[in-house]
């Protein structure tokens, strides 16, 4: 049987993610397949780089932690199809979270996966859910 955690423990674990990454997190949306893990080299073309708000995730509740504030870029970096994202600390080098990008059924929901250089776009939904929430 897998370990089970209380809602209180799950919420604390989720809140620790934002604390560990810091208040100046950087989101990069990329083309191509998601790397094997956060320790693997970056892959794909960077379509957008977003400096996230200083309080970029809401407080965890009921075993889930959702994005906070507006996550938007007024000018995409390149043209291509968004397929995955990585969240880095303020240095923009160390990956701490990664996942898929799409308009539905993915880890991060965006308004459009077809990026054109200089286009504006918005991240609609991003929520981290604890494993047994």
Q: Positions of the model-derived regions?
A:
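Small cysteine-rich, disulfide-bonded extracellular modules of the LU/uPAR three-finger superfamily
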Residues: 1-85, 89-133
């Amino acid at each position: 049987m897998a370990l089970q955690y209380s809602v209180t423990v799950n919420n604390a674990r989720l809140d620790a993610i934002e604390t560990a990454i810091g208040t100046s997190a950087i989101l990069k949306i990329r083309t191509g397949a998601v790397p094997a893990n956060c320790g693997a080299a970056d892959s794909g073309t960077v379509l957008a780089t977003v400096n996230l708000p200083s309080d970029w995730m809401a407080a965890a509740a009921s075993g889930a932690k959702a994005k906070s504030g507006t996550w938007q870029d007024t000018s995409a970096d390149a043209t291509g199809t968004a397929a995955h994202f990585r969240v880095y600390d303020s240095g923009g080098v160390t990956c701490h979270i990664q996942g898929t990008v799409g308009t539905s059924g993915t880890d991060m929901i965006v308004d459009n996966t077809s990026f054109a250089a200089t286009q504006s776009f918005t991240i609609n939904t991003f929520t981290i859910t604890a494993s047994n929430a």
